[in-house]
Amino acid sequence: MRLCDFAQEYVIRVGGSPGYAEQLRVLTKRLPWHVSDLTVDKIDRYLTTALQSLAATTVNNHRRMLNTLRKAALREGLLRDECIRPIRRVKAIFPEVRAWSHEEIKHLISTAKTLTGNTAHCPLSVFMPAYIVFAYTSGLRLGDMLAIRWDQVRGHRLSLVLRKTGQQHVVVLTDQSLAAIATLPRRGSGRIFGDLVSRRQFINHFRALVRKAELPGSSKFLRRSSATYAELSGIDATGHLGHRTADMKKRYLDIVILSENRRAVPALT
């Protein structure tokens, strides 16, 4: 049985999210393996080779997914491997997290208001400021931002099922974020942002906006900023982002912004 087919069946069987299914699809596309190839030795050799061309964090994710598929294959009797030692470790040092400060986000919004051109159904000078404010407030991923609908907004709450995890999630909205989306036209299936722009168009427009504003980063920085300022104000970023485990939030918190309330040591006298 081909590994790609087994991975697809595994996702369906365990009810995996679309995001997880896509990660497995990309990985198994790289590996023209069969299920019988999921031995410790072969996985070790792949990881060692992959480290020569891929980031350690990426290879570490590959290790995790291959180990999951290996365990599933062993349970179902599709794999025989008498090796009892664990798969080799991959030391992944996560890079320093960078988010946008409030001043940088305000500058980005000001720049967005000067944009010319349109999405398919809305001026960029209207769409982009609304998106930035709502994405910062909610901390949602791009896929969720493009999927949310008007009927999911109930007062100052937005209820949705996160596409990556399949978990129900509630976002607490501010007057500012509600006022931002009130400027947008309503169309089609009722998606707040997704009916106004495609994913590819959004990425291209946002990349151009960031360049014009002369800022580092991408739309992912809004999620990081949301997590960082949530934590800074006493809101647990784990629940705010919809993570299942608390350990994940460290990949989103900008420790420089978190240090805003810290004082320096007394100067030498």
Task: List where the protein language model places each region.
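Catalytic-site neighborhood detector that most strongly recognizes the C-terminal catalytic loop/helix
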Residues: 1, 99, 162-166, 241-266
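Major-groove DNA-contacting interfaces characterized by cationic-aromatic clusters
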Residues: 36, 81, 121-126, 158-161, ...
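Basic/aromatic-enriched alpha-helical hairpins
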Residues: 4-53, 65, 69-74
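Short, basic (Lys/Arg/His-rich) helix/loop patches that form interaction surfaces
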Residues: 114-124, 171, 183-191, 203-239, ...
